[in-house]
């Protein structure tokens, strides 16, 4: 990929797009871990902790692409809205948030992840990067649907 990105103004755009997705993945990784620790159903706990690891892997893949292209050093902070979202989820769990409430919070976070990937894929990106983002997006969409379905299932119990 580095040959496709060397020395153009397009580099800055690609870098900005990737950093936005990476920040969102950082938020997702932390959010899944935090919420996963507070869920009561074992199936959901396992899913959330595995999903946290998956988001860390996605982030590492994108960071590697940036490093290979000689671009940015990536922060470990995530976004401000992600930090607020995690804090809200933590507060809900401490105040007696049940699994349904925690899954609602997780779904909101997944909506942000879906948006980050959609926005990224609207840009002119090198084909290998577009393919990587498309594969990751597919997983994020499936994860969102899983979280939503489990949230909805808890309403009917």
Regions found by a protein language model. Name each.
Residues 13-21, 42-60, 99-103, 128-142:
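Alpha-helical scaffold segments that form or flank carboxylate-/histidine-based iron centers
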Residues 21, 28, 35, 58, ...:
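Amphipathic alpha-helices that form helix-helix packing interfaces
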Residues 2, 8, 43-46, 53, ...:
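Charge-rich, acidic-biased intrinsically disordered regions
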Residues 6-40, 99-124:
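Alpha-helical bundle segments that constitute or directly flank the non-heme di-iron/ferroxidase center
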Residues 44-80, 147-150:
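Conserved alpha-helical segments that form or flank metal/cofactor-binding pockets of metalloenzymes
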Residues 61-101, 105-114:
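Carboxylate-rich helix-loop segments that flank metal/cofactor sites and access channels
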Residues 2-10, 14, 20, 27, ...:
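Long, non-catalytic architectural segments outside compact domain cores
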Residues 106-157:
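Preference for long, well-ordered alpha-helical segments
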